[in-house]
Amino acid sequence: MQSFAQPPLESLRRMFSSGAVSISAEYEMIVQQMPVVGNSEILLQGKMYHLQGNGLEVFCNGDALWTIDESSKEVVIEPCDALYDAYVANPLLLLAELDSYFQIKSQKQAGSNTEYVLDAIKDCGISKAQVTLASDGRVLSGKFHLEDGNVVSAKVISMKKTEERSPSFFSPSRKFGSDWVVTDLR
């Protein structure tokens, strides 16, 4: 088994080890042979994140996860142990913890980039991943094979360190009125 302690992967780990990381990505998911495309903006900070994309806004403060659909005025609140579903819906959330969920099966150089094939070592809804990293540890793309047979491909448009946010940033600041359907599964 190859070690994650090598230049691009170590740089990626350091990027997530303190502060926050902002990621803008486009993705395509093949569901029952039909492509579903979209984009997302993610801010990851430790076990917390904020995600926006395709009409949904997701907050995770480390304890609770809110999935908000503004157009249908619905919000689902779950405990953060429901991250399994979040990883399947947006595998880029796993980037901060690649070495906790995967082992390196193989790697190859492609110019100054490194392409990794990773096998899951922990149940996260993803059985295999192919991730391409720039020499500085930035993720350029990923292809994630879900356990249900579907595949998610992501192209990272931008990825950068950003200032650390207050923990309150990772919880919705608004109240959901009586015109909202709120499902609280905590």
Each model region followed by its residue ranges:
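Flexible, surface-exposed loop/linker segments and immediately adjacent secondary-structure boundaries
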Residues: C80-G111
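One face of beta-strands
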Residues: V21-Y27, G38-I42, K47-L51, S127, ...
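N-terminal leader/targeting segments and the immediate start of mature chains
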Residues: M1-P35, K47-M48, K73, P172-R186
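Short beta-strand segments that buttress and anchor functional surface loops
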Residues: E26-M29, H50-N54, E115-K122, S141-H145
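Non-transmembrane domains of secretory- and envelope-associated proteins
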Residues: A110-G111, I121-S127, A134-R186
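An acidic-aromatic
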Residues: E41-A89, V152-S153
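Glycine-centered tight beta-turn/hairpin loop motif at sheet-sheet or coil-to-beta transitions
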Residues: Q33-P35, G55, S72, D123-I126, ...
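Short beta-strand micro-motifs enriched in acidic
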Residues: L43-Q45, Q107, T132-D136
